[in-house]
Amino acid sequence: MLRRLLKPNLVVTLRKLSSSSASYVDRHISVILCDQSLSLESLRKHNALIITGGLSENIFVASKLISSYASYGKPNLSSRVFHLVTRRDIFLWNSIIKAHFSNGDYARSLCFFFSMLLSGQSPDHFTAPMVVSACAELLWFHVGTFVHGLVLKHGGFDRNTAVGASFVYFYSKCGFLQDACLVFDEMPDRDVVAWTAIISGHVQNGESEGGLGYLCKMHSAGSDVDKPNPRTLECGFQACSNLGALKEGRCLHGFAVKNGLASSKFVQSSMFSFYSKSGNPSEAYLSFRELGDEDMFSWTSIIASLARSGDMEESFDMFWEMQNKGMHPDGVVISCLINELGKMMLVPQGKAFHGFVIRHCFSLDSTVCNSLLSMYCKFELLSVAEKLFCRISEEGNKEAWNTMLKGYGKMKCHVKCIELFRKIQNLGIEIDSASATSVISSCSHIGAVLLGKSLHCYVVKTSLDLTISVVNSLIDLYGKMGDLTVAWRMFCEADTNVITWNAMIASYVHCEQSEKAIALFDRMVSENFKPSSITLVTLLMACVNTGSLERGQMIHRYITETEHEMNLSLSAALIDMYAKCGHLEKSRELFDAGNQKDAVCWNVMISGYGMHGDVESAIALFDQMEESDVKPTGPTFLALLSACTHAGLVEQGKKLFLKMHQYDVKPNLKHYSCLVDLLSRSGNLEEAESTVMSMPFSPDGVIWGTLLSSCMTHGEFEMGIRMAERAVASDPQNDGYYIMLANMYSAAGKWEEAERAREMMRESGVGKRAGHSVV
């Protein structure tokens, strides 16, 4: 059947050729098999003719067939041809090894290599590079070292440049960079392949600086054999990108242009990638235009580069251009734009782009949904973020849970953050280090001591990456808990950064150990850490706590001498420090010297005047604040009400309290406490009572105590009894309220009622807490 399908005359010809000289046969078959227009089907027909013609044992013919089948991606057919040959030489073995190696079947190529060794055939300088490279691709280190030993044992070709380059590549690929360098240094001659292998090895193993060093050595060698090729330059640009070495990258760009390599697609692509990652959107844009046939990766890179530089308008222009050219965006480029919109807090644009995502059905892409969730968390649009989270969290999206956890932390929703973490634990979802930091910080803010300690155990138990952020949040947690021993131990064991120092200094200040905080600052400076504004603000708080004007002045001099940036927070802290340490003139001098003043600066200056009893100056400054179009805040009115209380300015205080509504400032418990104190001290007890009854929340002990004390002072015992009874009803477990009620009854001469109040206290199981002295 086969013979009927094939040309009979070709079979006859082959039979005649088989009796002719071997060299003539080889040449004739070679001409047939080297025909590039030969299809796979024709190749198989010729193979059949060769078998029927009795030439399957011909090594040269077999090697040609093996190579031809390999070029069609059919190494399995190459193996069939190989197995028909009984007497095999090194040329045939190399052919079958190459057939599988070139098609990515590295394990099979190594199997043939070991079969070759078992047959007694020794490898040559063509075999070794393929076998070693196969070991590199499979990361079979021990097999590769065995081959290295075999090469050294046989000798003769271990000093071959191709063999040496393959071993450099192998050791680099397996992560043994030092061994790769030893092999490279021992090579008597090095070609561009060897140089590229050692440069690439350094870059791939995170030693980009060393890679650039070898590139410079290669350039210094100066011979044509050592001249960098496009692949070498690609590695060089990658190294520059990893190091952020803009100057060196530009030099490499110039070298590529000078040596005619800039037109290479390898060079253009790597050059574009370098400029994109190095934060040079203009040069990245020019490189992008030189690419010509842009793919989705290059479009994504240029759009991301422009977006990261803050040029969102140009970034979106490129996004629309990409679509006009027939390129359909994928989830990666969509997510990239969403992430940058979130970072830049472009809320209207972010919402509009969300509409584009929905219209083009990208809302089903988990990567896009996670980016949208992150964006809305950054916008602090809690309701939208929660709605989106409810939709995507049902799909078991681990990243979404972590994003929402971090979002709650960012939006100061500490209770929700902790509740979500508990739910995550119940579902068995893993959290990342950033999420752990958010939960630990939430525990610090709401005083969840036990949960905070449990989180520390969780971090250790789950072998979570103990990043510096996690350590800093734990130091802050233990500092706020008052456990300075653990906080200090973690500080000493950590790879500290400025934030770590800040956390430890803040812990000392929080625990009222300001002297230790100041001493730690001195150590921080001596160890060449540059304090941040947060460090200095915290230290000024320590100076306030200790009343140390001298130390505060030293910190002020440090700020001036080091030319530290004087931002609004630091300026406000200095004004506050001088005011609270008794140097009101200096405080006002700094206030007047400030070019920009936010509400905090105005507040601390007003508070300073109130603290020193200069109510007129405080109110005058408030009037200036209104004229400067700075909106007063809650602390502004609290400082003013406190000043009016101490000065007894009832009408002025009432006007200020009513003025809060004008600025949409909702009074809190402290504002009401000041107003009640102001009214009570002036004898306006009925108005004070009316104020307490109209409060939108329950009074605390301070308000009840203020009101009852004034009732006692002004002899309003009936009102005092009425207020005390309400206080007891509001909090039956507060021993102070029972005592105040009993005292009020006693003052009114109602001894039986006083005794009954004490009896109620005993029946409720409330005992009077023992007094203590702070001396």
UniProtKB/Swiss-Prot annotation:
Record carries keyword Repeat: yes
Subcellular location, record wording: Mitochondrion
Region (Type E motif): 703-775
Transit peptide boundaries: 1-17
Pfam families in the record: E_motif (PF20431), PPR (PF01535), PPR_2 (PF13041)
Keyword tRNA processing: no
InterPro entries linked: E_motif, Pentatricopeptide_rpt, PPR_At4g14850-like_plant, TPR-like_helical_dom_sf
GO CC entries: mitochondrion
Intrachain disulfide bonds: none
Any one GO MF annotation of this record: RNA binding
Signal peptide: none
UniProt keyword annotations, A-Z: Mitochondrion, Repeat, Transit peptide
PPR repeats: 58-88, 89-123, 124-158, 160-190, 191-225, 229-263, 264-294, 295-329, 330-364, 365-395, 397-431, 432-466, 467-493, 497-531, 532-566, 567-597, 598-632, 633-667, 668-698
Family listed: Belongs to the PPR family. PCMP-E subfamily.
Listed name of the protein: Pentatricopeptide repeat-containing protein At4g39952, mitochondrial
